[in-house]
C-alpha cells in the first residue's frame, strides 16, 4: 500500500514576537490587541523557500537508502518564477539528474496537490519513491491578519509502498472558486476581505 515512508521539517530559528507587531500598529487597529500573544517563525536574510526545503528534505532523506524517482516542490512564494525550484532542490540534495521534478505553485492547495500527485506517481508505478517538499515564506501587509498568523517553514515527506509509516487510504478534493483572498500576478501581498 502507498503511504508516507519518512518525513522531515525545517523551521527558521528567527522569531517575531506578535506583541511587537501589535504594539507598532494598535493605534490604527485596536482590535489587534487580542492577538498579541506568542511568536511566529521568520526567515533570516539568507533563507528562502528553496533553502528551507533543502533542510527539510535532508532531515527526511537521512534514513533513505535509495534516491527518490520524483521530486515535487510546492510553494506560493518560490524564489524563481521561470526557473525550476525543484531542480535546484534536487541538485542541492545530490539527487541523480534522471529524477522527475515538478514545481506546484499559485495556490495554498499546492502542498496537498503535490502530495496527491506523488501518491499517484508511486501508486501508478511511475517510480518506487517520490519526495514531496512544501515550503513558504509569505510576504504580508503590515498589521494584516497574515502578518500575525503566517510563519515561515518547510516540510518534506517521501512517498513509497514499502515500510510505510502512514498508509494512504483515500482522498477527497473539492474545487470551488471561493475568493476569500487572492494575490494577483506581480503583486507582493494577498488581497483579503
Regions found by a protein language model. Give the residues of each.
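Phosphate/pyrophosphate-binding loops at sites that engage ATP/ADP/AMP, CoA/4′-phosphopantetheine
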Residues: 56-69
Amino acid at each position: 500500500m502507498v503511504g508516507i515512508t519518512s518525513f522531515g521539517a525545517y523551521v527558521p530559528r528567527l522569531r517575531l514576537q506578535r506583541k511587537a507587531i501589535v504594539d507598532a500598529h494598535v493605534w490604527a487597529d485596536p482590535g489587534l490587541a487580542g492577538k498579541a500573544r506568542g511568536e511566529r517563525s521568520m526567515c533570516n536574510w539568507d533563507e528562502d523557500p528553496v533553502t528551507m526545503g533543502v533542510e527539510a528534505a535532508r532531515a527526511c532523506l537521512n534514513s533513505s537508502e535509495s534516491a527518490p524517482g520524483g521530486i515535487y516542490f510546492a510553494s506560493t512564494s518560490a524564489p524563481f518564477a521561470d526557473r525550476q525550484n525543484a531542480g535546484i532542490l534536487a541538485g542541492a540534495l545530490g539527487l541523480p539528474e534522471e529524477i522527475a521534478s515538478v514545481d506546484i505553485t499559485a495556490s495554498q492547495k499546492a502542498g496537498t496537490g503535490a502530495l496527491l500527485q506523488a501518491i499517484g506517481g508511486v501508486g501508478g508505478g511511475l517510480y518506487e519513491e517520490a519526495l514531496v517538499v512544501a515550503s513558504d515564506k509569505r510576504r504580508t501587509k503590515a498589521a494584516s491578519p497574515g502578518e500575525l498568523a503566517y510563519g515561515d517553514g518547510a516540510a518534506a515527506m517521501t512517498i513509497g509502498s514499502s515500510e510505510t509509516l502512514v498508509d494512504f487510504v483515500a482522498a477527497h478534493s473539492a474545487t470551488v472558486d471561493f475568493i476569500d483572498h487572492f494575490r494577483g500576478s506581480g503583486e507582493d501581498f494577498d488581497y483579503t476581505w
